[in-house]
Each structure stands twice: as structure tokens, then as C-alpha cells.
A protein has these predicted regions:
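Divalent metal-cofactor coordination and adjacent catalytic microenvironments
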Residues: 1-130
């Protein structure tokens, strides 16, 4: 398993999510909508044990993935980024076809399982896969 680069870890949660959504990071007209949905995704992740115990909220472009995850959960970074992106996309820019929406829902469920399992492996210290 590769270690995330410092640029990936220190990325702004808002700006990296906007980039994945295809929204120009310099445009702020959709920030409120994107932030609200990011915070919803982060609350879901917090309920499965990822992020600070007291919760975490994005208010703008300064909050980073490292702040949310801490240094103990960096092994789940890519899954967490993908989860937040898909969660926000599903609400902010949903697909028109129901089968595409179902695919996003299935991906969200799979990522929740992977993130939860990855978090448990870190807690147990079982990072070696056989």
C-alpha cells in the first residue's frame, strides 16, 4: 500500500472536491452548496469512526484532509476522498438515469464498508494483508 504524498494530505477538502466535480476552484458561486454536502458526507464518515470524535466541518478552502483524518487514518485517504466526492456528486449533480444513480449508491455503500474495515485494521495494527 502506498503512502499518500504530502500534497494529497494537505489538499483543501473544498478545492479538491470542486476539482473532481468539474467546478473551477476559483469560482465560489457554488461553494455554499458544495460545502453543505461535504459536511453531510463528513458527518456520515464520523459515524463510522473516521475523523475527529467531536466531528469536523468545512467552512471554506482552508480545511484539509490531514486535519480531518489526523495522521492515524491516512491509509484510508483515497477511499475517503472518493466517498466525499461521490456523496457530493450524488446530491449536487445527480445523474439523470436511475441506473447511474443506483451505481453511485452502490459505490457509496462499498466505500463505507471499505473505509470502516480499513479503519478497524489500523486500530488493530493489522495493516499487512495476506
Amino acid at each position: 500500500m502506498s503512502t499518500p504524498s504530502s500534497d494529497e494530505v494537505n489538499d483543501s477538502i473544498l478545492l479538491s472536491t470542486k476539482k473532481l466535480l468539474g467546478v473551477d476552484p476559483t469560482m465560489d458561486m457554488f461553494d455554499l452548496d458544495v460545502i453543505m454536502n461535504i459536511n453531510s458526507a463528513l458527518a456520515n464518515l464520523n459515524q463510522i469512526g473516521v475523523g475527529p470524535h467531536e466531528g469536523y466541518f468545512v467552512n471554506g478552502p482552508v480545511e484539509t484532509w490531514a486535519e480531518f483524518l489526523g495522521h492515524n487514518n491516512l491509509t484510508v485517504l483515497q477511499n475517503v476522498k472518493q466517498y466525499v466526492y461521490i456523496w457530493v456528486k450524488r446530491v449536487f449533480d445527480p445523474p439523470g438515469a436511475t441506473n447511474h444513480l443506483a451505481a453511485l449508491d452502490n459505490t457509496i455503500k462499498e466505500l463505507e464498508w471499505r473505509i470502516s474495515t480499513g479503519r478497524e485494521e489500523v486500530i488493530r495494527g493489522d495493516t499487512e494483508h495476506v
